[in-house]
UniProtKB/Swiss-Prot annotation:
Protein name, per record: Auxin response factor 3
Biased composition (Low complexity): 1-22
A Pfam family the protein falls into: ARF_AD
GO biological process, one term: auxin-activated signaling pathway
Tissue: Expressed in roots, culms, leaves and young panicles.
Family annotation (SUPFAM superfamilies): DNA-binding pseudobarrel domain (SSF101936)
Quaternary structure note: Homo and heterodimers.
Species per Swiss-Prot/TrEMBL record: Oryza sativa subsp. japonica (Rice)
GO molecular function (one): DNA binding
GO terms for cellular component: nucleus
Gene label: ARF3
Region: Disordered, residue numbers: 1-41
UniProt cross-references to InterPro entries, sorted A to Z: ARF_dom (IPR010525), ARF_plant (IPR044835), B3_DNA-bd (IPR003340), DNA-bd_pseudobarrel_sf (IPR015300)
Amino acid sequence: MASSASSSSSPSSRPPLMALPSFYRPPWPSERGGEQRATDCWAGSPAAGGGRARATAMGIDLNNTASGGEEDAPAPGPVCRDLWHACAGPVVSLPRRGSAVVYLPQGHLSAAGAGGGIRGEVAVALPPHVACRVVDVELCADAATDEVYARLALRAEGEVFERNLHGGGIEREDDMEDGDEERKSRMLHMFCKTLTASDTSTHGGFSVPRRAAEDCFPPLDHKQLRPSQELVAKDLHGAKWRFRHIYRGQPRRHLLTTGWSSFVNKKKLVSGDAVLFLRGDDGELRLGVRRATQLKNEAIFKAFSSESSKMRTLSAVADSLKHGSVFHICYNPRATASEYVVPYWKFVKSFNHPVCIGMRFKFHFESEDVNERRSGMIAGVSEVDPIRWPGSKWRSLLVRWEDATDCNSQNRVSPWEIEIVGGSISVAHSLSASSSKRTKLCPQGNLDVPALYGNGRPDSVETEKFPRVLQGQELMGSRTHRATCSPQSIDITKSKSFDAWRFLTDTRSCMLGSSTSRLPVQYSGYTHQSVSFGESIGFPEVLQGQEISQTVPPFQGMLPDACSAKSRYELKNYVCTPATMNGLSSANEGYCLSLSTVPPSPPSSLMLYQTGVPQLELASKNNDKSGNDSQPALRQHKLLSETSWDQFKIGKASTPGNATKPGNGGREVDRTSCRLFGFSLTEKIIPTDKDGEKEVSYETDCQNPRMLDLFGYNCSTPGALHALCAAPLGI
């Protein structure tokens, strides 16, 4: 007990947690009687794994009884550069120490799964492109997955751009760590094979091509009956693997048998992965793995996965820009399709060659240890995230691949990743402004941001100088609502025009309008002209190719049902005008408003045609003596609004086709007929007055009344057409 108390009072033998019982923590070496007991206890519990731990200490592996396999890995040292590049692939290249590169924070965050920002926003204000100087390059490999990566030490330097702008020297391609020719000269004794199902089976071996075995492996003694030898190869981490190399079978072939299954199980290799052997100039054999499916690189993921680590990295970049300090990043060129550490010369070269839509390009990518090229065409130029990273060139090109393979479903590439093929493209696809004095077909402005017009829909930027020629499939509600105002001679004075415009503004609130137009009501001294024939305000417009898409902006407002009876509408030449309205003085009443004097264009066979051009007049108070006349006019207004509002044509003040019959009680009778497919829609209509008496709206002494053939019957009833037109609306 005394010894126990003395040992407990010693601060060097016990941690501060003295209140915990002994079964909550492993016993310390002083309690077990030595350092060996502590090692056995940490390796496994005495009941379940103590024997296994002691067997492991003796060099016996109970999980692998086959001879050969992995030896004890030494302390981690530098990775072989040739083996690192062989595992990385032929396309990957690293910058030299002291060379200039461009660091892209947006690409770095995207590779880490942050989508170009931290929690939806960029926490640290950084430019999209950071020019840096490479201080150090450390080649690394993940111990769990054998994925290669590099740890770069960079220092931000703004003088690199300044020297380039002032005509200084620019780093060239030889500033990379090693070129393809230099790498191939050092890797003459190397082969890479994609594993098959038999190579990854439990009891099988690894079949080596004959030429590869003779080039990389030491020669066999073929004088023996069964030639064989033992091979020792080092992996990326310096661990040694032992294999038995034999030459047998019918036909004879080279096989790696003993130790191969242990290697496959340890590395978790599957069919489709690649294994490569490399023999250096010193004769030492090295072994590497290149997986078909990229596994998560734990070393990089832990270093740049949490929000705090990302904040520290971005803050270090900001400090380097401000104070010139060194910051470190882990760079895995195989983890992302677009690099975020680009050589400076390649970055500047992409800026010197402008990119246009429609250009063809070649793209380098890796496939089964070969450097293949794919062709494509540039379909668009836009920033991935213009809000958080404005002006970024990272993955700014939208591409369309020409072959079936779309390069891992990658529809965006960076300008420095492609090689432009040819320079001739269509003028309509060019993004750069032409220097010609002729009218440019390419609009000026940002083509990537849609423009919102008055109709409330996004629309592409289009020049206003060229009239559109429609083919019949466009709707009037898309872009034709933007009426073109041309200065013309106005028939009335400026003051009268202002009052007329006020009347037009008040009238728009009660007339049937289009829900697609949201143009603000503003006064303008110009008149609106409509080149198309009498078409509906709310219906699609079908042009034949010769009309110019300049239409009157539609009236917007309430439906006809929303108009109260107190307004007392009158029908005059197919236009309803309120007898009394707000905003129009009595002195100005009775004036005529002429908004269009352009004659209609030739009609279409599919549209309604109006023989006369109606007018829009301001009714005076003298014409509104009683409210009895408003009921037939309102009924006729409902009839005409159901059949077609296409007959509204804001035209001249007087039309020869309109006349007033004195024998009808002062009511104006319009002889202009509205026809649908050749049949009259307005003749022989007998409206009913309020007092029950029937009165003919048109000439009752018509010598040749028209007979309307409906559904195969000759109908002579004057009200048949009225009943047919009014039936859908319940009139």
